[in-house]
C-alpha cells in the first residue's frame, strides 16, 4: 500500500508542473508559430478548420504549437501526462483508458524522423482519436 501511495504522489508531483492552457493561449501560440514559420494564408485557413495536410510546413507548425504548449519536446517527444491533463483539466480523475488511448498515439521516434515529422505523426493521431475532446478543452468559455 505504501508503494501505491508513493507512486501516486510521484505521478502527482510530475504532472503538477504543467499548467493547463486556455483558448487565449492556443490562439497566441498559433499566431506565434504562423509568424515564426511564415505559414501561408491558405494553410492557416486549413488549420483553423482543424485540417493539417502532410507537408513540411504543416509538420513544423504542429511541432511549434505542441512545443509551445509544453506537450512536445524535440528530445523526448510527447508528454502524455501533460496531454492528458490539458484535455481533462487539473482536477479531473485520471482515467486509465483515456490515458492509454493517448499513449497509443505517441512513439519514441524509433523511425529516426526529424522533429517536425515526429510531432506531426503523433499529433495527427491525437487529433484523429480525440478531436471532440481537444475542441471541448479549447472552446470559448461562456
Curated annotation (Swiss-Prot):
Tissue: Expressed in larval chemosensory organ. Specifically expressed exclusively in a subset of chemosensory sensilla on the third antennal segment.
Outcome after substituting residue 49 to R: In strain: 88A, 195A, 217A, 223A, 233A, 256A, 360A, 380A, 482A, 554A, 639A, 716A, 790A, 820A and 855A
Record's subcellular location: Secreted
Domain of life assignment: Eukaryota
A Pfam match: PBP_GOBP
GO BP of this protein: olfactory behavior; response to pheromone; sensory perception of chemical stimulus; sensory perception of smell
Keywords for this protein: Disulfide bond, Olfaction, Secreted, Sensory transduction, Signal, Transport
UniProt GO cellular component terms: endomembrane system; extracellular region; extracellular space
Key word Hydrolase present: no
Annotated GO MF terms: odorant binding
Disulphide bonds in the chain: 33-64, 60-116, 105-125
Effect upon mutating residue 139 to G: In strain: 40A, 822A and 832A
Task of the protein: Present in the aqueous fluid surrounding olfactory sensory dendrites and are thought to aid in the capture and transport of hydrophobic odorants into and through this fluid.
PANTHER family in the cross-refs: GENERAL ODORANT-BINDING PROTEIN 99A-RELATED, ODORANT BINDING PROTEIN-RELATED
Annotated protein name in UniProt: General odorant-binding protein 99a
Species for this entry: Drosophila melanogaster (Fruit fly)
Gene encoding the protein: Obp99a
Amino acid at each position: 500500500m505504501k508503494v501505491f501511495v508513493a507512486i501516486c504522489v510521484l505521478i502527482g508531483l510530475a504532472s503538477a508542473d504543467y499548467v493547463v492552457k486556455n483558448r487565449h493561449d492556443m490562439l497566441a501560440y498559433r499566431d506565434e508559430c504562423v509568424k515564426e514559420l511564415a505559414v501561408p494564408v491558405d494553410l492557416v485557413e486549413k488549420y483553423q478548420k482543424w485540417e493539417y495536410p502532410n507537408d513540411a510546413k504543416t509538420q513544423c507548425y504542429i511541432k511549434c504549437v505542441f512545443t509551445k504548449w509544453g506537450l512536445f519536446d524535440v528530445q523526448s517527444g510527447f508528454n502524455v501526462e501533460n496531454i492528458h491533463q490539458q484535455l481533462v483539466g487539473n482536477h479531473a480523475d485520471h482515467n486509465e483508458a483515456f490515458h492509454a488511448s493517448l499513449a497509443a498515439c505517441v512513439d519514441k521516434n524509433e523511425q529516426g524522423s526529424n522533429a517536425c515529422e515526429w510531432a506531426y505523426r503523433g499529433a495527427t493521431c491525437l487529433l484523429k482519436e480525440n478531436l471532440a475532446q481537444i475542441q471541448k478543452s479549447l472552446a470559448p468559455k461562456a
